[in-house]
Swiss-Prot record:
This is 2-aminoethylphosphonate--pyruvate transaminase. It comes from the Bacteria. Belongs to the class-V pyridoxal-phosphate-dependent aminotransferase family. PhnW subfamily. InterPro entries: Aminotrans_V_dom, NH2EtPonate_pyrv_transaminase, PyrdxlP-dep_Trfase, PyrdxlP-dep_Trfase_major, PyrdxlP-dep_Trfase_small, SP_NH2Trfase/AEP_transaminase. Keywords: Aminotransferase, Pyridoxal phosphate, Pyruvate, Transferase. Homodimer.
Length: 365
């Protein structure tokens, strides 16, 4: 049990360690040499987490939520005559579509039900039929439900048809092993407050250098200009163009050190996976069924179907909060669900305590 007023069983923001919180008790200057050196170390560590072919990739940090970084990529990477195929089966894929439409980018959608993974056959059919598509985007872990999408197959198809690949790995990077060079991912986006277990305040983009260089002058926004942000960090030793979240960066650096101490991404994945499997098994015992088929389920967050018509999520939420737990409501339209996250500083004992608390307040059957 961590020293928190609530245990956040959510997909980020999430429960952080005491040591991550403690580094935010101090103040730093954005122009300080030591701080900028830390920014450079963070950038390098992220690339090393993403691939062994580190010389081919670089990292750009971007102020704001993860969505800001996604929009920075969409608005900077796709040229005026570009066209994007978006694979969507949840709120975050739909958000990418909305961004493209707001930025007047031509977009095609491959949509599946929220509990079904991206349909590779349909994706290939679209790529065969529409030769104008230049980019393809997919969400790795769609936290709307907790489903994992087949990014290996999507990126393989993307490269087979000569497309630039964009992967929203917001809720998976750092918790699921990904080699972006091996998967031929051109741009991967994630956030400080997800599986690396930092706090909210910035997102990051791990980009193939060759593709990033093509983005100069293409941005549709000043503050979300991915190329300019990178060029400043690259040429001015870690400096951000605009005020950076200094406390958040220090917390993230500490979180990276703690990820290494835990044993890296593989070890963290194992903990998350054990949490998720234990959660599902215990929840089944008291009558709750997961929405997503086991073979498509991520270790990040799990959606559970309301057991009966009389089930009152708000009542359960309030009872759990009194017991020191915070969970998530559902986010899909066709099935009543609620969600429980498995990531953050959460361990087996926490899962047992949570389900015991749920069982105390809910009688099914």
């Amino acid at each position: 049990m961590t020293e928190n007023h609530y245990l956040l069983l959510t997909p980020g923001p999430l429960t952080t360690t005491k040591t991550v919180k403690e580094v935010m008790l101090y103040d730093w200057c954005t122009w300080d040499v030591e701080y900028n050196m830390m920014v450079q170390q963070v950038r390098a560590k992220l690339v090393s987490l993403a691939t062994k072919e580190e010389e081919r990739y670089t990292t750009v940090l971007m102020q704001g939520s993860g969505t800001f970084s996604v929009e920075a990529v969409i608005g900077s990477v796709i040229p005026k005559n570009g066209k994007m195929l978006v694979c969507t089966n949840g709120a975050y894929g739909k958000r990418i579509v909305q961004m493209a439409e707001m930025l007047h980018i031509d977009v095609v959608v491959s949509q599946t039900e929220e509990w079904e993974p991206t349909n590779i056959v349909e994706v290939e059919k679209i790529l065969q039929q529409d030769k104008e598509i230049t980019h393809i985007a997919v969400v790795h872990c769609e936290t709307t439900t907790g489903i994992i999408n087949p990014i290996v197959d999507v990126c393989k198809l993307g490269k087979q048809y000569g497309k630039v690949t964009l992967v929203d790995a917001m809720s998976s990077f750092g918790g699921i092993e990904i080699d972006i060079a091996e998967l031929q991912i051109d741009f991967l986006i994630s956030s400080a407050n997800k599986c690396i277990q930092g706090v909210p305040g910035f997102g990051f983009v791990i980009a193939k250098r060759d593709e990033l260089l093509k983005c100069k002058g293409q941005a549709r926004s000043l503050s979300l200009d991915l190329y300019d942000q990178w060029e400043t960090m690259e040429n001015q030793n870690g400096k951000w163009r605009f005020t950076s979240p200094t406390h958040v960066v220090h917390a993230f650096y500490q979180a990276l050190l703690e990820l290494e101490k835990e044993g890296g991404v593989k070890a963290r994945y194992n903990r998350y996976d054990n949490n998720q499997k234990l959660l599902v098994n215990r929840m089944r015992e008291i009558g709750f069924k997961p929405l997503v088929d086991e073979k498509y389920q991520s270790p990040i967050i799990t959606s559970f179907i309301y057991p009966e018509e009389w089930f009152d999520f708000e009542q359960l939420y309030n009872e759990l909060k009194r017991d020191g737990f915070v969970i998530y409501p559902g986010k899909i339209s066709k099935v009543d669900t609620f969600r429980i996250g498995n990531i953050g500083d959460v361990h087996e004992a926490d899962i047992h305590r949570l389900v015991d608390s749920i069982a105390k307040g809910v009688v099914i059957g």
